[in-house]
């Protein structure tokens, strides 16, 4: 089922599209299937088979006040990560099964995190038996992550007690693809179905956390690319919820219509275009980084945005070169993309750190980084709290020699 296409946008069509998303995607019904692999080193783990339904009758003895101690939920530790098999129709690039992870926390505050792991768009870059430039399987396990927003013991973590949904990445398409079984020739057939897999996170929130007060959509590297799209989809589905979007380490890719169209054609990005008034007539050629912010930001002006990047991010530079944009400067493109977004009427505060490092949200540096006298974790905390934040941009940005 094609879940999206370019059509004339309207509020009614938007509602229809969101309703379709809940029922569409890959492996309908797979959300309810959990595995036995949900483990945490010190935390309790919940699975769907953990507590069978009680069977009581009216003839059972009534409990006394001393039979069981009172439960004090305020002192219980957060629950561990639960691995959920997405369903038979969800798949990684090589056809292996796709699963995502949920960590129960405060149900009124939810973080949807998209994992990174490269990209591919040619036989050479996608060949799993060669030198692939992307993660082939959904092997990342948040139980093994203990840095950045996943450092649940750090008192400075602004989302430490939130419910978290972690979407692994294994399709090489920036979580934007809807093209299953793309044939690159030479026997290389790849599932670029990252958007369809990502809809499982959307479904999880709408079905189980639809009354949340606040949802932060974020992701690092390739996981930052779909943030505006999924923030918009959630704003459409949950109009009473405050939606925040913060991509990490993905703002420095130029929007070139020719390259957008070629790569988008391989990935099937047109299948991810929502039914919004701002996307009327949009094709894959107009699915660049600043455009995604513009479509979602203008359609849903209550979404609050922010963005993090390193000024000369070496990974972003290398993938721009791989796509044929050798002359692009990451810092210059960061400035251009921010300008295009804000000129279109979408406010986008940015935090640009010096150097060539890549990502911040899953690293210990999240608590250590300070630029122009402003700590990143303080800037992030203020953003989440709804405080006004300004651009923080390095003056000595450490351009590589």
Residue spans of the language-model regions?
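Bacterial signal peptide processing site
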Residues: 27-30
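Sec-dependent N-terminal signal peptides
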Residues: 15-20
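C-terminal His-loop and adjacent cap/lid subdomain of alpha/beta-hydrolase
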Residues: 67-401
């Amino acid at each position: 089922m094609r879940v999206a296409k370019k059509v004339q946008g309207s509020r009614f069509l938007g509602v229809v599209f969101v309703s379709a998303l809940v029922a569409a995607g890959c492996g309908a019904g797979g959300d309810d299937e959990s595995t036995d692999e949900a483990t945490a080193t010190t935390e309790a783990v919940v699975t769907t088979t953990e507590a069978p339904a009680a069977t009581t009758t009216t003839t059972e003895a009534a409990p006394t006040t001393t039979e069981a101690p009172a439960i004090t939920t305020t002192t219980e530790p957060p629950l561990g990560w639960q691995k959920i098999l997405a369903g038979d129709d969800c798949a990684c690039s090589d056809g292996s099964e796709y699963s995502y992870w949920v960590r129960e926390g405060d149900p009124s505050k939810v973080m949807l995190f998209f994992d990174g792991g490269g990209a591919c768009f040619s036989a050479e870059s996608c060949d799993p038996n060669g030198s692939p430039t992307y993660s082939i399987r959904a092997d990342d396990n948040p139980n093994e992550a203990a840095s950045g927003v996943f450092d649940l013991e750090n008192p400075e973590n602004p989302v430490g007690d939130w419910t978290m949904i972690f979407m692994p990445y294994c399709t090489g398409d920036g979580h934007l693809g809807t093209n299953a079984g793309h044939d690159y020739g030479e026997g290389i057939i790849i599932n670029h179905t990252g958007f369809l897999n990502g809809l499982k996170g959307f479904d999880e929130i709408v079905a189980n956390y639809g009354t949340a007060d606040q949802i932060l959509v974020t992701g690092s590297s390739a996981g930052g690319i779909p943030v505006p799209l999924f923030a918009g989809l959630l704003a459409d589905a949950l109009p009473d919820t405050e939606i925040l979007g913060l991509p990490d380490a993905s703002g420095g890719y130029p929007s070139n219509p020719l390259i957008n169209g070629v790569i988008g054609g391989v990935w099937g990005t047109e299948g991810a275009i929502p039914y919004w008034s701002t996307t009327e007539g949009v094709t894959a050629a107009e699915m660049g980084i600043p455009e995604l912010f513009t479509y979602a930001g203008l359609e849903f002006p209550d979404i609050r945005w922010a963005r993090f990047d390193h000024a000369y991010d070496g990974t972003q530079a290398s993938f721009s070169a791989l796509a044929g944009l050798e002359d692009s400067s990451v810092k210059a493109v960061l400035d251009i993309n921010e300008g295009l977004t804000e000129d279109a009427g979408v406010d986008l505060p940015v935090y640009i750190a010096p150097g060539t490092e890549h990502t911040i949200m899953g690293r210990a540096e999240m608590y250590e980084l300070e630029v122009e006298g402003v700590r990143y974790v303080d800037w992030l905390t203020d953003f989440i709290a709804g405080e006004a934040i300004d651009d923080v941009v390095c003056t000595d940005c450490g351009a590589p020699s």
